[in-house]
Amino acid sequence: MLPLEGKLVLSIEQVIAAPFCTRQLADLGARVIKIERPEVGDLARGYDKRVDGIASHFVWVNRNKESLAIDLKDPDGLEFIKTILPKVDIFVQNLAFGASKRLGLDYENLKKYNPKIIVCDISGYGEGGNYGHKKAYDLLIQSESGLVSITGTQDECVKVPISIADISAGMYAYSGILQALLYLEKTGKGSRVEISMLECMAEWMNYPLYYTYKNATPPERKGAFHASITPYGPYKAKDGVVMFGLQNPREWESFCKIVLQDESLIEHEDFKNNTLRTKNASKVKEIIEDAFKNLSAKEVVDRLDEAKIANGNVNELNQVWEHPQLKARNRWREVDSEVGKIPALLPPATNNNYEARMDKIPALGEHTESILKEFGFSDKINLFKEKKII
Protein backbone atom coordinates (compact mmCIF):
# COMPACT_ATOMS: atom_id res chain seq x y z
CA MET A 1 0.00 0.00 0.00
CA LEU A 2 1.25 3.46 -0.91
CA PRO A 3 1.08 6.32 1.64
CA LEU A 4 -1.46 8.47 -0.24
CA GLU A 5 -3.73 5.75 -1.60
CA GLY A 6 -7.35 6.81 -1.22
CA LYS A 7 -6.59 10.54 -1.51
CA LEU A 8 -8.23 12.41 -4.40
CA VAL A 9 -6.34 15.35 -5.85
CA LEU A 10 -7.95 17.81 -8.27
CA SER A 11 -5.46 20.06 -10.02
CA ILE A 12 -5.86 22.96 -12.43
CA GLU A 13 -2.26 23.07 -13.49
CA GLN A 14 0.15 24.23 -16.15
CA VAL A 15 3.77 23.61 -17.10
CA ILE A 16 6.03 22.68 -14.11
CA ALA A 17 5.33 24.01 -10.60
CA ALA A 18 1.88 22.53 -9.90
CA PRO A 19 2.34 19.47 -12.18
CA PHE A 20 5.61 18.56 -10.43
CA CYS A 21 3.90 18.84 -7.06
CA THR A 22 0.96 16.65 -8.06
CA ARG A 23 3.11 14.08 -9.85
CA GLN A 24 4.93 13.50 -6.58
CA LEU A 25 1.60 13.08 -4.78
CA ALA A 26 0.61 10.60 -7.48
CA ASP A 27 3.93 8.77 -7.11
CA LEU A 28 2.85 8.11 -3.51
CA GLY A 29 -0.48 6.67 -4.59
CA ALA A 30 -2.83 9.67 -4.68
CA ARG A 31 -5.38 9.75 -7.46
CA VAL A 32 -4.68 12.94 -9.44
CA ILE A 33 -7.25 14.36 -11.84
CA LYS A 34 -5.51 16.90 -14.04
CA ILE A 35 -7.89 19.52 -15.47
CA GLU A 36 -6.87 20.72 -18.94
CA ARG A 37 -8.34 22.97 -21.59
CA PRO A 38 -10.13 21.03 -24.36
CA GLU A 39 -8.11 20.71 -27.59
CA VAL A 40 -5.21 22.76 -26.16
CA GLY A 41 -4.33 21.09 -22.87
CA ASP A 42 -1.44 21.94 -20.59
CA LEU A 43 0.80 24.47 -22.35
CA ALA A 44 3.79 22.19 -21.73
CA ARG A 45 2.32 19.64 -24.15
CA GLY A 46 3.36 21.97 -26.97
CA TYR A 47 6.86 22.88 -25.83
CA ASP A 48 8.60 20.29 -28.02
CA LYS A 49 8.20 16.77 -29.39
CA ARG A 50 11.50 15.31 -28.23
CA VAL A 51 10.16 12.12 -26.60
CA ASP A 52 8.73 10.17 -29.54
CA GLY A 53 6.37 13.06 -30.24
CA ILE A 54 5.58 14.06 -26.64
CA ALA A 55 7.07 17.14 -24.97
CA SER A 56 10.00 16.49 -22.64
CA HIS A 57 8.66 18.72 -19.84
CA PHE A 58 5.27 17.02 -20.00
CA VAL A 59 6.71 13.50 -19.86
CA TRP A 60 8.68 14.37 -16.74
CA VAL A 61 5.89 15.75 -14.53
CA ASN A 62 2.67 14.06 -15.63
CA ARG A 63 2.89 10.32 -15.13
CA ASN A 64 0.28 8.61 -12.92
CA LYS A 65 -2.43 11.18 -13.72
CA GLU A 66 -5.89 11.21 -15.29
CA SER A 67 -6.55 13.94 -17.86
CA LEU A 68 -9.95 15.65 -17.69
CA ALA A 69 -10.33 18.09 -20.59
CA ILE A 70 -13.17 20.45 -19.66
CA ASP A 71 -13.92 24.14 -20.20
CA LEU A 72 -14.15 25.83 -16.81
CA LYS A 73 -15.29 29.09 -18.39
CA ASP A 74 -18.54 27.39 -19.36
CA PRO A 75 -21.02 27.31 -16.44
CA ASP A 76 -21.81 23.63 -17.08
CA GLY A 77 -18.13 22.68 -17.02
CA LEU A 78 -17.57 24.61 -13.82
CA GLU A 79 -20.70 23.11 -12.28
CA PHE A 80 -19.32 19.61 -12.86
CA ILE A 81 -16.13 20.50 -11.01
CA LYS A 82 -18.13 21.91 -8.11
CA THR A 83 -20.21 18.73 -8.02
CA ILE A 84 -17.18 16.57 -7.27
CA LEU A 85 -15.55 18.96 -4.78
CA PRO A 86 -17.09 17.32 -1.67
CA LYS A 87 -15.06 14.19 -2.51
CA VAL A 88 -11.80 16.04 -3.17
CA ASP A 89 -9.10 15.83 -0.49
CA ILE A 90 -6.52 18.12 -2.10
CA PHE A 91 -7.00 20.96 -4.60
CA VAL A 92 -3.97 22.45 -6.38
CA GLN A 93 -3.82 25.36 -8.80
CA ASN A 94 -1.24 27.61 -10.42
CA LEU A 95 -3.57 29.75 -12.52
CA ALA A 96 -2.91 33.40 -13.31
CA PHE A 97 -3.48 35.96 -10.56
CA GLY A 98 -7.14 36.15 -9.50
CA ALA A 99 -8.36 33.38 -11.83
CA SER A 100 -9.26 30.85 -9.13
CA LYS A 101 -11.27 33.46 -7.21
CA ARG A 102 -13.17 34.51 -10.35
CA LEU A 103 -14.09 30.86 -10.88
CA GLY A 104 -15.19 30.49 -7.27
CA LEU A 105 -12.37 28.02 -6.68
CA ASP A 106 -10.52 29.93 -3.97
CA TYR A 107 -10.08 28.49 -0.49
CA GLU A 108 -12.97 30.42 1.09
CA ASN A 109 -15.38 28.92 -1.44
CA LEU A 110 -13.82 25.48 -1.63
CA LYS A 111 -14.04 24.84 2.11
CA LYS A 112 -17.82 25.29 1.86
CA TYR A 113 -17.90 22.08 -0.18
CA ASN A 114 -15.47 20.25 2.09
CA PRO A 115 -14.33 21.86 5.37
CA LYS A 116 -11.38 19.46 5.55
CA ILE A 117 -10.07 20.20 2.06
CA ILE A 118 -6.42 21.11 1.58
CA VAL A 119 -6.00 23.86 -1.00
CA CYS A 120 -2.59 24.68 -2.45
CA ASP A 121 -2.23 27.94 -4.38
CA ILE A 122 1.01 28.44 -6.30
CA SER A 123 1.91 31.86 -7.70
CA GLY A 124 4.94 33.88 -8.64
CA TYR A 125 4.97 36.35 -5.79
CA GLY A 126 2.19 35.41 -3.37
CA GLU A 127 -0.85 37.50 -2.51
CA GLY A 128 -0.54 41.17 -1.68
CA GLY A 129 2.30 43.61 -2.04
CA ASN A 130 3.21 45.43 -5.22
CA TYR A 131 4.11 42.20 -7.02
CA GLY A 132 1.11 40.02 -6.17
CA HIS A 133 -0.69 40.70 -9.44
CA LYS A 134 2.34 40.33 -11.72
CA LYS A 135 2.96 37.52 -14.18
CA ALA A 136 5.90 35.36 -13.22
CA TYR A 137 8.00 32.95 -15.25
CA ASP A 138 10.99 30.94 -14.11
CA LEU A 139 13.58 33.32 -15.61
CA LEU A 140 11.94 36.32 -13.95
CA ILE A 141 11.95 34.67 -10.53
CA GLN A 142 15.58 33.61 -10.98
CA SER A 143 16.31 37.27 -11.71
CA GLU A 144 14.20 38.77 -8.91
CA SER A 145 15.65 36.39 -6.32
CA GLY A 146 19.24 37.36 -7.17
CA LEU A 147 20.18 33.94 -8.54
CA VAL A 148 21.04 35.26 -12.01
CA SER A 149 23.29 37.94 -10.48
CA ILE A 150 25.64 35.31 -9.01
CA THR A 151 25.47 32.73 -11.83
CA GLY A 152 27.80 32.79 -14.81
CA THR A 153 31.22 34.31 -15.35
CA GLN A 154 32.84 37.66 -14.63
CA ASP A 155 31.85 38.76 -18.13
CA GLU A 156 28.23 37.65 -18.16
CA CYS A 157 25.49 36.57 -15.78
CA VAL A 158 23.34 33.63 -16.92
CA LYS A 159 20.18 31.81 -15.88
CA VAL A 160 20.22 28.28 -14.54
CA PRO A 161 19.21 26.22 -17.61
CA ILE A 162 16.61 24.10 -15.80
CA SER A 163 13.39 25.60 -14.42
CA ILE A 164 14.75 25.83 -10.90
CA ALA A 165 12.21 28.38 -9.61
CA ASP A 166 9.31 26.26 -10.84
CA ILE A 167 10.93 23.13 -9.44
CA SER A 168 11.48 24.71 -6.02
CA ALA A 169 7.84 25.83 -5.95
CA GLY A 170 6.70 22.32 -6.84
CA MET A 171 8.85 20.83 -4.10
CA TYR A 172 7.59 23.22 -1.41
CA ALA A 173 3.99 22.75 -2.57
CA TYR A 174 4.45 18.98 -2.24
CA SER A 175 6.00 19.19 1.23
CA GLY A 176 3.46 21.83 2.28
CA ILE A 177 0.59 19.53 1.33
CA LEU A 178 2.15 16.64 3.25
CA GLN A 179 2.43 18.96 6.28
CA ALA A 180 -1.24 19.90 5.86
CA LEU A 181 -2.21 16.22 5.75
CA LEU A 182 -0.40 15.65 9.05
CA TYR A 183 -2.12 18.72 10.51
CA LEU A 184 -5.48 17.39 9.33
CA GLU A 185 -4.76 14.07 11.01
CA LYS A 186 -3.92 15.80 14.31
CA THR A 187 -6.62 18.50 14.36
CA GLY A 188 -9.32 17.52 11.87
CA LYS A 189 -8.84 20.89 10.16
CA GLY A 190 -8.25 21.57 6.48
CA SER A 191 -5.65 24.08 5.31
CA ARG A 192 -4.74 26.60 2.69
CA VAL A 193 -1.12 26.19 1.61
CA GLU A 194 0.21 29.23 -0.26
CA ILE A 195 3.41 28.94 -2.29
CA SER A 196 5.30 31.92 -3.71
CA MET A 197 7.99 31.09 -6.26
CA LEU A 198 9.96 34.14 -5.14
CA GLU A 199 9.90 33.01 -1.52
CA CYS A 200 10.97 29.50 -2.50
CA MET A 201 13.99 30.84 -4.34
CA ALA A 202 14.74 33.39 -1.60
CA GLU A 203 14.96 30.44 0.83
CA TRP A 204 17.44 28.69 -1.46
CA MET A 205 19.41 31.94 -1.78
CA ASN A 206 20.03 32.26 1.97
CA TYR A 207 23.75 31.40 1.74
CA PRO A 208 24.57 34.20 -0.74
CA LEU A 209 22.21 36.54 1.12
CA TYR A 210 24.08 36.00 4.37
CA TYR A 211 27.39 36.19 2.50
CA THR A 212 26.43 39.77 1.59
CA TYR A 213 25.12 40.59 5.09
CA LYS A 214 25.20 44.35 5.85
CA ASN A 215 26.11 45.21 2.24
CA ALA A 216 29.21 43.02 2.10
CA THR A 217 30.68 42.20 -1.32
CA PRO A 218 28.52 39.59 -3.12
CA PRO A 219 29.93 36.23 -4.25
CA GLU A 220 32.00 36.54 -7.39
CA ARG A 221 30.61 34.95 -10.55
CA LYS A 222 33.14 32.20 -11.30
CA GLY A 223 31.45 29.85 -13.74
CA ALA A 224 31.69 26.29 -12.45
CA PHE A 225 34.18 27.29 -9.76
CA HIS A 226 33.06 27.90 -6.18
CA ALA A 227 32.86 31.52 -5.08
CA SER A 228 34.27 30.92 -1.59
CA ILE A 229 36.07 27.54 -1.60
CA THR A 230 39.36 26.83 -3.44
CA PRO A 231 40.17 24.50 -5.09
CA TYR A 232 36.62 23.57 -6.04
CA GLY A 233 35.62 23.24 -9.68
CA PRO A 234 36.79 21.98 -13.09
CA TYR A 235 40.53 21.69 -13.76
CA LYS A 236 42.19 20.72 -17.03
CA ALA A 237 44.21 17.55 -17.42
CA LYS A 238 46.12 16.39 -20.52
CA ASP A 239 43.06 14.90 -22.22
CA GLY A 240 40.03 16.34 -20.46
CA VAL A 241 38.59 18.08 -17.44
CA VAL A 242 38.31 16.77 -13.88
CA MET A 243 35.83 18.19 -11.37
CA PHE A 244 36.79 18.06 -7.70
CA GLY A 245 36.56 20.00 -4.47
CA LEU A 246 38.25 20.33 -1.08
CA GLN A 247 36.45 21.08 2.18
CA ASN A 248 38.99 21.18 5.03
CA PRO A 249 42.70 21.58 5.96
CA ARG A 250 43.24 17.83 6.14
CA GLU A 251 42.12 17.47 2.52
CA TRP A 252 44.39 20.33 1.42
CA GLU A 253 47.35 18.57 3.02
CA SER A 254 46.45 15.27 1.37
CA PHE A 255 45.88 17.02 -1.97
CA CYS A 256 49.33 18.63 -1.90
CA LYS A 257 51.10 15.42 -0.86
CA ILE A 258 49.40 12.87 -3.09
CA VAL A 259 47.80 14.72 -6.00
CA LEU A 260 50.15 17.66 -6.60
CA GLN A 261 53.11 15.85 -5.03
CA ASP A 262 54.41 19.14 -3.66
CA GLU A 263 54.36 19.37 0.16
CA SER A 264 55.83 22.90 0.10
CA LEU A 265 52.38 24.21 -0.81
CA ILE A 266 50.75 22.99 2.42
CA GLU A 267 51.98 25.91 4.56
CA HIS A 268 52.70 28.35 1.74
CA GLU A 269 51.84 31.91 2.80
CA ASP A 270 49.48 32.35 -0.14
CA PHE A 271 47.68 29.01 0.16
CA LYS A 272 47.77 27.70 3.75
CA ASN A 273 44.07 28.29 4.41
CA ASN A 274 40.93 28.47 2.32
CA THR A 275 40.54 32.25 2.62
CA LEU A 276 44.03 32.77 1.19
CA ARG A 277 43.52 30.16 -1.52
CA THR A 278 40.26 31.79 -2.62
CA LYS A 279 41.94 35.20 -2.64
CA ASN A 280 44.64 33.69 -4.86
CA ALA A 281 42.37 31.36 -6.82
CA SER A 282 43.96 32.15 -10.19
CA LYS A 283 47.40 31.19 -8.83
CA VAL A 284 45.99 27.97 -7.37
CA LYS A 285 44.41 27.10 -10.71
CA GLU A 286 47.69 27.76 -12.53
CA ILE A 287 49.63 25.50 -10.14
CA ILE A 288 47.07 22.70 -10.38
CA GLU A 289 46.79 22.74 -14.16
CA ASP A 290 50.57 22.88 -14.51
CA ALA A 291 50.77 19.74 -12.36
CA PHE A 292 48.03 18.07 -14.42
CA LYS A 293 49.27 18.99 -17.91
CA ASN A 294 51.12 15.71 -18.40
CA LEU A 295 48.53 13.55 -16.64
CA SER A 296 45.47 11.98 -18.20
CA ALA A 297 42.11 12.67 -16.57
CA LYS A 298 42.09 9.06 -15.35
CA GLU A 299 45.50 9.47 -13.74
CA VAL A 300 44.30 12.60 -11.96
CA VAL A 301 41.17 10.82 -10.73
CA ASP A 302 43.29 7.91 -9.48
CA ARG A 303 45.41 10.32 -7.44
CA LEU A 304 42.31 12.12 -6.13
CA ASP A 305 40.78 8.81 -5.09
CA GLU A 306 43.99 7.79 -3.34
CA ALA A 307 43.96 11.12 -1.47
CA LYS A 308 40.26 10.66 -0.65
CA ILE A 309 39.36 13.89 -2.46
CA ALA A 310 35.78 14.08 -3.75
CA ASN A 311 35.67 14.17 -7.54
CA GLY A 312 33.32 13.60 -10.42
CA ASN A 313 33.03 13.43 -14.19
CA VAL A 314 31.73 16.30 -16.30
CA ASN A 315 29.15 14.13 -18.04
CA GLU A 316 27.20 14.95 -21.15
CA LEU A 317 23.47 14.17 -20.96
CA ASN A 318 23.81 11.05 -23.10
CA GLN A 319 26.26 9.74 -20.50
CA VAL A 320 23.73 10.33 -17.71
CA TRP A 321 21.28 8.06 -19.54
CA GLU A 322 23.93 5.34 -19.23
CA HIS A 323 25.27 6.32 -15.81
CA PRO A 324 26.64 3.16 -14.18
CA GLN A 325 25.46 4.13 -10.69
CA LEU A 326 21.86 4.66 -11.79
CA LYS A 327 22.00 1.25 -13.46
CA ALA A 328 23.71 -0.43 -10.53
CA ARG A 329 20.97 0.83 -8.21
CA ASN A 330 18.23 -0.20 -10.66
CA ARG A 331 16.72 3.30 -10.82
CA TRP A 332 15.19 3.08 -14.29
CA ARG A 333 11.63 1.93 -14.96
CA GLU A 334 9.27 2.27 -17.93
CA VAL A 335 6.01 4.20 -17.97
CA ASP A 336 3.31 3.87 -20.58
CA SER A 337 2.12 6.72 -22.79
CA GLU A 338 0.08 7.35 -25.92
CA VAL A 339 3.24 6.63 -27.96
CA GLY A 340 4.32 3.53 -26.04
CA LYS A 341 6.79 2.81 -23.27
CA ILE A 342 9.10 5.60 -22.09
CA PRO A 343 12.01 5.20 -19.63
CA ALA A 344 11.58 7.07 -16.34
CA LEU A 345 13.63 7.40 -13.18
CA LEU A 346 12.15 6.35 -9.86
CA PRO A 347 11.68 9.23 -7.39
CA PRO A 348 14.85 9.88 -5.35
CA ALA A 349 13.35 8.98 -1.94
CA THR A 350 13.55 5.20 -1.67
CA ASN A 351 11.40 3.53 1.00
CA ASN A 352 12.08 -0.05 2.02
CA ASN A 353 8.33 -0.77 2.38
CA TYR A 354 7.12 0.13 -1.11
CA GLU A 355 8.11 1.25 -4.60
CA ALA A 356 6.66 4.44 -6.01
CA ARG A 357 3.85 4.24 -8.52
CA MET A 358 5.03 4.52 -12.13
CA ASP A 359 1.90 4.57 -14.29
CA LYS A 360 0.86 6.06 -17.61
CA ILE A 361 1.36 9.61 -18.90
CA PRO A 362 -2.14 10.60 -20.05
CA ALA A 363 -3.18 11.73 -23.50
CA LEU A 364 -5.18 14.96 -23.55
CA GLY A 365 -8.70 14.24 -22.30
CA GLU A 366 -8.03 10.51 -22.11
CA HIS A 367 -10.15 10.11 -18.97
CA THR A 368 -12.80 12.77 -19.55
CA GLU A 369 -15.73 10.49 -20.32
CA SER A 370 -14.90 7.92 -17.64
CA ILE A 371 -14.68 10.66 -14.99
CA LEU A 372 -17.98 12.22 -16.09
CA LYS A 373 -19.65 8.82 -15.88
CA GLU A 374 -18.11 8.06 -12.49
CA PHE A 375 -19.51 11.24 -10.97
CA GLY A 376 -23.00 10.91 -12.40
CA PHE A 377 -22.82 12.99 -15.57
CA SER A 378 -23.31 10.21 -18.14
CA ASP A 379 -26.42 11.87 -19.51
CA LYS A 380 -24.53 15.15 -20.07
CA ILE A 381 -21.67 13.79 -22.17
CA ASN A 382 -23.32 14.34 -25.56
CA LEU A 383 -24.49 17.81 -24.55
CA PHE A 384 -21.01 18.71 -23.35
CA LYS A 385 -19.57 17.52 -26.65
CA GLU A 386 -22.08 19.55 -28.64
CA LYS A 387 -21.26 22.66 -26.63
CA LYS A 388 -17.52 21.88 -26.90
CA ILE A 389 -17.21 21.91 -23.13
CA ILE A 390 -15.18 18.69 -23.43
What are the roles of these predicted feature ranges?
Residues M1-L8, P219-E220, K236-A237, Q319-I390:
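Terminal low-complexity tails and localization/encapsulation signals of metabolic enzymes
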Residues E127, Q154-I164, E185-M201, E220-A227, ...:
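Conserved Rossmann-fold dehydrogenase catalytic segment
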Residues D305-L326:
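Conserved PLP cofactor-binding pocket of PLP-dependent enzymes
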